[in-house]
Amino acid sequence: MINIRGIQGHAAYPHNAENPIHTSSEALNEIVALQWPDKSGQFPDSILQVSNIQSGTGAHNVIPGELSLKLNVRYSPSISSQTVIDAVEGILRKHKLNFSADWEDSGAPFLTTSTTLINCAIESIANVTGVNEVEQSTAGGTSDGRFIAPTGSEVVEVGPLNTSIHKVDEAVSIDELEMLTEIYGKVISKLLT
């Protein structure tokens, strides 16, 4: 969470206030334009999204005294969370904004390079779905795999299609759940034999 402070005041007297929405607009444009290409060729480029902005009292005649901003960053192993923090805070400082930041890293990216678990998953998916060209991808959302990977364990994520992920009426078909159950069972069987 980033808090950008201004000075609250009456909208009719802007010279007695400092609107953080106005003072931060150029910095926000620079922040959303940040780019971090993946250098490994195994991950999508890192992305930054503004997920929440809150400012104001709700009254139309009051200049807000603070703007709160939440960012969501999906980054590849080509950069670190500190790289993102330094870039964002550098922009805020460049624009001389009065800010405080409380950063939370929801999990570092990971990549399983061992083929044992990967091959078991690919074979199981092909066996259950009949799809022989299984796409391996590091794109997508954050999962609990980020907590397991640092232990040194192999991590492979197999899940449903995500065409409605985080949308209104998010849903997964029963058929997909049944196929996943069968795939998981086959992966376990292959690993135990």
What are the functions of these language-model segments?
Residues 1-193:
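Metal-dependent amide/peptide-bond hydrolase catalytic core
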